[in-house]
Amino acid sequence: KNGFPGRILTTRLTADLMKIMLLDSAHIQESDAEYENRKGERAGREHVDPLYTEQDALDVFKYVTTCEYKEKVDLCEGVSAVFTDAGHLLGSASITLELEENGVHKTIVFSGDIGNVDQPIIRDPQLLKKADYVVMESTYGDRNHTEVWSYTDELAEIIDETLGKGGNVVIPSFAVGRTQELLYFIREIKDQKLVKSTPNFPVYIDSPLAKAATTVFCGDLHGYLDEQALELVKDGTHMFTFPNLNLVESSEESKMLNMDTTPKVIISASGMCDAGRIRHHLKHNLWKPECTIVFVGYQGEGTLGRSLLEGVRSVKLFGEEIAVHAKIVNFQGLSSHADRDHLLAWIADIKAPKPQHVFIVHGDREVAPYFAESVEKLGFTAHAPQYTEVYDLIDDKIVAPGYLPERKAKAVGGQRVS
């Protein structure tokens, strides 16, 4: 839209998911702009354009080039890229840039989000052996995940207990990756008849984006699945379908769910509860002590999801103060991010050659420098660069310092969260 003329290089399945997500986001941008313009016209404000439109999103794909894992892609003279499975989401990748100039050869690895081990469906992160420099994430750099003996058994216990009391299980979930994992586990729960109180309990997927993304997960996944998932596919098992699974289409159907008193499982986006249909379901279920809200993913600072996990007693939704009486469960083991120990194991495996410098990014402002210290204890040189910092790789020094952006206080449930 602003004149970018180059290529957008990504894995095949990331491109498939990106198209769905960009179109969904563009639709929201257009709807929000239309709403603001209706209000603004009455108030005499200037016309607002959407950040991008659905046509803009479609135009992106004129520039997209797809590749597969381990395929070397020449970007220009002396620069090539190799994508390695990061085990985070379907199609996710760490990227190794190979640079050569005047006979000098260097490699820079960008970790991207590194995945958790033993996730269903996708493979574990593929380890890398060499790099001169590494730019590495630190989402969970200060903690380890709670060990879970069986995701299926634990989730079944939560569902059984809640539905047995006549309540609903409401699961805020990311539409891509996490929702499909939940469907995988619930299929196992139903196959094994683990929910005794309501064996044929209804499950509602209330996210058009999740529905569209699931079609990608049901497509050609050659080269992306783990061994267990491959066996299921060979046996003809549909990994994400089971009896009494209901896909909610319209917003009217979504609202009707809250009029239905049948105990049920509702999976809806967004995963951090800051937007989407999940907010309606929270409004109708948070105040009920018989209901359970299950968080199955990372909750960022300042989000409604983080506030609920931290024990806020009430929240404001759609102009109403809603008391929090439902049981709040943090299903920590179910994470698509590597925890502290697995992040350290990932970087420790890069040793031929050992990186000259490791840059720690993509973590809360307290977490990134803490994790950098952990990496240094392994014998690496590491630091967490600040925003806009410029680092000279040849001279191995900071040439322009960065800064920490000011934290903005955010109102959540009538309270200021900073």
Model-derived regions, located:
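His/Asp/Glu-rich metal-coordinating catalytic cores
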Residues: 1-181, 187-198, 202
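Amphipathic alpha-helical heptad-repeat segments
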Residues: 21-22, 27, 360, 373-377, ...
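A general structural motif
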Residues: 114, 146-152, 243-253, 271-274, ...
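Short, compositionally biased "basic patch" segments
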Residues: 120-135, 222-228, 299-325
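Hard-cation-handling environments
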Residues: 158-302, 316, 361, 367-369, ...
